[in-house]
Curated annotation (Swiss-Prot):
Catalyzes the GTP-dependent ribosomal translocation step during translation elongation. During this step, the ribosome changes from the pre-translocational (PRE) to the post-translocational (POST) state as the newly formed A-site-bound peptidyl-tRNA and P-site-bound deacylated tRNA move to the P and E sites, respectively. Catalyzes the coordinated movement of the two tRNA molecules, the mRNA and conformational changes in the ribosome. The lineage of its organism: Bacteria, Pseudomonadati, Pseudomonadota, Gammaproteobacteria, Thiotrichales. Residues 8-290 form the tr-type G domain. Belongs to the TRAFAC class translation factor GTPase superfamily. Classic translation factor GTPase family. EF-G/EF-2 subfamily. Signal peptide: none annotated. Pfam families: EFG_C (PF00679), EFG_III (PF14492), EFG_IV (PF03764), GTP_EFTU (PF00009), GTP_EFTU_D2 (PF03144). It is found in: Cytoplasm. The keyword Metal-binding does not apply. This is Elongation factor G. GTP binds at residues 17-24, 88-92, 142-145. HAMAP family: EF_G_EF_2_B. Its main location: cytoplasm. One of its GO terms (biological process) is ribosome disassembly. PROSITE patterns: G_TR_1 (PS00301), G_TR_2 (PS51722).
Length: 704
């Protein structure tokens, strides 16, 4: 069966932003203009097509990334039909994992900013993630009809706060309630959308006289940016100072694909102005699957390899999201990088070492689905019938095995105990939690060995609230939820040398392991800039500890890191160097050296000036000027350190570092201080030492 749409005409894009920048509304408008959704769903009516979980419609925020397929031929039908796969991602910081997963499988992104609030903390997180995966992007400055909206100010913020090279391709005509339309800087005409048909049609008119000069200045900057794409364009520009429309498009596209510039559009999705031009921008400037570098992967032997985006290459896809559907069971969302997959085909999962058969393949439109017979390179679809696949697994051809890069998931920072309300709920709860944990790798479940309680951990209070809410609604499990617990850690502060000997000899074969290990604080970061947990160095000379036992010593130390010496919290930031020891020809074994390693850490850490660490959150509070003093006083009482202040149209912005332990219930508190007018967001920043008096309390309560 040949392709319906050529690969060059595909666009896999994500729509990402901060909470409330108007991302879901923008997606709804895209579905309306591309003809998929005949009635526009508004978020504030709780009817948006892409927000399909009950909790999302109630809370007015997007939690899971819904994937949808749609088609676009341009505002003037100037393109051949392009197929656009859109993933709508959540903007709340507790759901960063969803954004990370989506960006991993996309080729391009539209980042939405609010015209009045501009760059917010979550925008920085999303931007960082898009940089990590090298995703080319364009910017849509939305809500230009809001009070305080200022397109050029937001572009300047993106330059300074996100260090991005922003090139506006439009200029707004009016702002706030006078927002009328946009100037297209390439055609040098004003676009006025027709309000009667919700913006389906528009007219091109002359640029208002008062904006002519500014439009010409911005146009010159844009043409310069396009000319820098190649020597030919630069020469032509230097000779005549002008480029044709096609040359401008070509130059801008080349630089967006290289992640050198970010084009800025503006409008108001809610007022049906501007989204149509963004769709043209997606087709014109964002890459097709075969215009991004071939996906990097590894062979089974760990050798680096890559897969071109082509139907003729062997099949390879990444499972980037799992969802449970009440009617069909497990849905596995996949992004196909190469090859073809037909329903009923067997696929191999090299991460699990298992072969599975794909039952059916469906194309998702938010939560409606159309069954399809096959998927090809570049497609995003959901498979039904896969049992043992988890997020981040590779599915591939068994004859040509590759492993696509694994995704790194953040460690949870907050835990609560959950108890089923009745015996009948007990079993249902463990099934429900298991399914929810399979869907969301940033959510963990474990049983506390001492108390026997079930502990769930996640990225924030809202994250866990929604998990408990989903248990109740989707799995009909009633549970009591305990107070939140902080994920404390332990570390060492000084260098110490420790001998440990594990000997059992009482006739017959005994056990013998003897090591000398140096422990010291580890101040190193990984490629994501996060602090490393553990590093093991082998400095054994002359074979005093045989090679085959060295890995066992490392393993013993690493396992012992899970039980800190002060209050039993996991230890981080430890460097261990094995430098001496001895062995016995008959009695030494891997087990004996593993136990010796764990004994060395247990004893050594006690002498190495151990301390307790707590998660510190980066908190940003936006508050009207009148409440500034009260909000800052409250942050100081919470052991917060104020790092700086900014201004934005909603008031003052306070940036602070505050221990997570002091942030429980902050949402309610800050609302009451500011009479509901302040808002805040927080994300994990780092671990830091707990003050002595608080550390004593933590140790006492853990050991009692």
């Amino acid at each position: 069966m040949p392709r319906n749409t050529a690969l060059e005409k595909y666009r896999n894009i994500g729509i990402c932003a901060h909470v409330d920048a108007g991302k879901t509304t923008t997606t709804e408008r895209i579905l309306f203009y591309t003809g998929l959704s005949h009635k526009i769903g508004e978020v504030h009516d709780g009817a948006a097509t892409m927000d399909w979980m009950e909790q999302e419609q109630e809370r007015g925020i997007t939690i899971t990334s819904a994937a949808t397929t749609t088609f676009w031929s341009g505002m003037d039908q100037q393109f051949e039909k392009h197929r656009i796969n859109i993933i709508d991602t959540p903007g709340h910081v507790d759901f960063t994992i969803e954004v990370e997963r989506s960006l991993r499988v996309l080729d391009g992104a539209v980042v939405v900013f609010c015209g009045s609030s501009g760059v917010e903390p979550q925008s920085e997180t999303v931007w960082r993630q898009a940089n990590k995966y090298g995703v080319p992007r364009i910017v849509f400055v939305n809500k230009m009809d809001r009070s305080g909206a200022d397109f050029e100010r937001v572009c300047a913020q993106i330059k300074t706060r996100l260090k991005a090279n922003v090139v506006p391709v439009q200029l707004n005509i009016g702002a706030e309630e006078d927002f009328k339309g946009v100037i297209d800087l390439i055609r040098m005409k004003a676009i006025m959308w027709n309000e009667e048909d919700m913006g389906l049609t528009y007219e091109l008119v002359d640029i208002p006289a008062d904006l002519q000069d500014r439009a010409e200045e911005l146009r010159m900057e844009m043409i310069e940016a396009a000319a820098e794409a190649s020597e030919e364009l630069m020469e032509k520009y230097l000779e005549g100072g002008e480029l044709s429309e096609d040359e401008i498009h070509q130059g801008l596209r080349a630089r967006v694909l290289n992640n050198e510039i970010v084009l800025a559009f503006c409008g108001s999705a809610f007022k049906n102005k501007g989204v149509q031009a963004v769709l043209d921008g997606v087709v014109r400037y964002l890459p097709a699957p075969n215009q991004v570098p071939a996906i990097k992967c590894e062979t089974e032997d760990g050798e680096p390899a890559s897969r071109p985006s082509s139907d003729d290459a062997p099949f390879a896809a990444l499972a980037f999201k799992l969802a449970t559907d009440l009617f069909v069971g497990n849905l596995t969302f996949i992004r196909v990088y190469s090859g073809v997959l037909k329903s009923g085909d067997a696929v191999y999962n090299p991460v699990k070492g298992k072969k599975e058969r794909v039952g059916r393949i469906v194309q998702m439109h938010a939560n409606k689905r159309d069954e399809i017979k096959e998927v090809r390179a570049g497609d995003i679809a959901a498979c039904i019938g896969l049992k043992d696949v988890t997020t981040g697994d590779t599915l591939c051809d068994q004859e040509d095995v590759v492993i696509l890069e694994k995704m790194d998931f953040p460690e949870p920072v907050i835990s609560v105990a959950v108890e089923p309300k009745s015996k009948a709920d007990q079993e249902k709860m463990s099934i429900a939690l298991g399914k929810l944990a399979a869907e969301d790798p940033s959510f963990r479940v474990k049983t506390d060995e001492e108390s026997g309680q079930t502990i769930i951990s996640g990225m924030g209070e809202l994250h866990l609230d929604i998990i408990v809410d989903r248990m109740r609604r989707e799995f009909k499990v009633e549970a009591n939820v305990g107070n939140p617990q902080v994920a404390y850690r332990e570390t060492i502060r000084s260098k110490v040398e420790q001998e440990a000997k594990f000997v059992r000899q009482s006739g017959g074969r005994g056990q013998y392991g003897h090591v000398f290990v140096r422990f010291e604080p580890l101040d190193e970061v990984d490629e994501n800039g996060e602090a490393k947990v553990f590093k093991f160095v082998d400095e054994v000379v002359g074979g005093v500890v045989p090679k085959e036992y060295i890995g066992s010593v490392a393993k013993g130390i690493e396992e012992q890191l899970n039980n800190g010496v002060l209050a039993g919290y996991p230890m981080i930031g430890v460097k261990a160097t094995l430098y001496d020891g001895s062995y016995h020809d008959v009695d030494s074994s891997e087990m004996a050296f593993k136990i010796a390693g764990s004994m060395a850490l247990k004893e050594g850490a006690k002498k190495a000036n151990a301390c307790i660490l707590e998660p510190i959150m980066k908190v940003e509070v936006v508050t009207p000027e009148d409440y500034l003093g009260d909000v800052m006083g409250d942050l100081n009482r919470r052991r917060g350190i104020i790092e700086g202040m900014d201004e934005n149209p909603s008031g003052r912005v306070i940036n602070a570092l505050v221990p997570l332990a002091e942030m429980f219930g902050y949402a309610t508190n800050v609302r009451s201080i500011s009479q509901g007018r302040a808002s805040f967001s927080m994300e994990f920043k780092k671990y830091a030492e707990v003050p002595n008096n608080i550390a004593d309390e933590i140790i006492k309560s853990r050991n009692s």
